[in-house]
Amino acid sequence: MAQASRKAVVAIAGSSGMIGSALAAALRANDHLVLRIVRRTPANAEELHWNPESGEFDTDAITDVDAVVNLCGVNLGQRRWSGSFKQNLRDSRITPTEVLSAAVAEAGVKTFINASAVGYYGNTRDRVVDENDRAGTGFLAQLCQDWEGATLPAQYAGTRVILARTGMVLAQEAGVLSRMRPLFSFALGARIGNGRQYMSWISLEDEVRALLFAISHQSLSGPLNLTGPAPVTNAEFTTAFGRAINRPTPLMLPSFAVRAALGEFADEGLLIGQRAIPAALERAGFQFHHNTIGEALSYATTRPSQN
């Protein structure tokens, strides 16, 4: 936080989501003050109103804030992609970031942490990438570039900006595992396509711990891969998840079937992957609680996610 010896004030946009709610709980557990940035009428003094579509936000409300964390964004796999939904994916990320970045710059907030994704790197195949690698190609890679680019006003103002390029977050109650578990429980879990595409993952516990680490470590800035240290192929993930819940995983879902069911999202989000590693986090001394996919899945499937 701003200083380890005093309570920090952290404002969070997107605090009702899986990551945001877990981060808010962890901050409060460490006796820090959390301000939730909400669209509705604030229920108490710890909520700040905004309307990102209209640009409405009271900059004065964050002049005494130590860090602003922006986790806004519609879920990529929420529905089959259409032109309008792809625009929604962009608008739900870029517009809030533009509003908050300008507000942070005007208010002089010292730290701005903005969500991004490892999709920034495009399809890396089996090539290992870290924060020094260039952006890839495709819709998601361009989306991430534009999303990160929306933080420029804060960067130009001298704010310490963290671009939190997150992988697949593993948690019990929400996220991808909660959607996959019913299929795997009936032995219907399957590798996707040839299963050789890489998946960069992180447990929810380590995701939150990494965000707390980024807030408190002033030496960190720029892109930060929030992923576990050992990315795995889709086939390896499928086997590990089946093992974690004691179910066989003998099936394979052909690429053509995935494309038929999910359209463009299949080629952008499931049939390609990123082999991203958390080089910047590890250089800064961050230590993961879950270093392997087996450890992360065992944790996420045998106990409630907590921090």
UniProtKB/Swiss-Prot annotation:
InterPro entries: DUF1731, Epimerase_deHydtase, NAD(P)-bd_dom_sf, SDR39U1. CDD domains: SDR_a8. Belongs to the NAD(P)-dependent epimerase/dehydratase family. SDR39U1 subfamily. This is Epimerase family protein ML0860. It comes from Mycobacterium leprae (strain TN).
